Amino acid sequence: MGKLDGKTAIVTGGARGIGLAIARRYIAEGARVVIADIDEGGKAAAASLGVAARFVRTDVGAAGDARNVVAEACGVSGDLDILVNNAGIIHTADFLDIAEADFDRVIRVNLKGMFLIGQVAAKQMVAQVKAGKPPGVIVNMSSINARVAIPNQVPYCVSKGGVDQLTKVMALSLAPHGIRVNAIGPGSIMTDILKGVATDQAAKHRLLSRTPMGRIADPDEIASVATFLASNDASYITGETIYVDGGRLALNYTVPVAGN
């Protein structure tokens, strides 16, 4: 018997990487999963996971799409039990150079999108509780960059800081209904974005020099935490961000010092 038997989940950004790993693990634990992604590759991803998965093309920053994907998920079994807010993008530019449009684009996906789908999903979950059904669970994807800034990742760092606070606000608002909301803060995970860095030995060395465990994590390791948070094993945990970073945030490391 799986930890998520009979549950219906939405995983945004589920076409690849961490989102796909979470979708795969949820299905292995007995859940039905709706992969919500703007990437049409989500269709093939869902097909690869079998009959327990379906794909709904979703722009998380569009309110209409947020309502649609929740309705589609409820069409699977009548209820929505789990939402994983995983969709996210980056834009690399220095603070002095980044354009307003690029800043807005990242915030729209990473933070506003999480709010939009989170609110629609939460309203559905509250209605289910009022109907005498079990409370749902929401898992938001944060990052160590909610706590540790990178100079050329301005909107990403800002958005993830916002995710941590949004998670707390959601948790407090929904606790009276028994609905739990937590976040996961990954460190260096072997996604498509990081694979390019991992093949550059100098870049990989810099990455590992600030990772005490000395390796890059696999997306399945994030999926394990997402499964725990969605399950009854985490029944008294809400409003928390669990950092999965190989010890990165515990490390107090030095920076280069200019000569006198």
Predicted regions and their residues:
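Residue(s) in the substrate-gating loop at a strand-loop-helix junction
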Residues: S143
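Active-site loop immediately N-terminal to the catalytic Tyr-X3-Lys motif
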Residues: L96, V148-V154, P176, G214, ...
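Substrate-binding pocket helix/loop in short-chain dehydrogenase/reductase
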Residues: D94-F95, A99-I107, L207
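Active-site helix of classical SDR
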Residues: G118, S159, T167
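C-terminal helical subdomain
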Residues: A183, A202-D233, I237, G246
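Short C-terminal tail/terminal secondary-structure segment
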Residues: T238-N260
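Alpha-helical segment proximal to the catalytic Tyr-Lys
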Residues: K123, L172-P176, S235
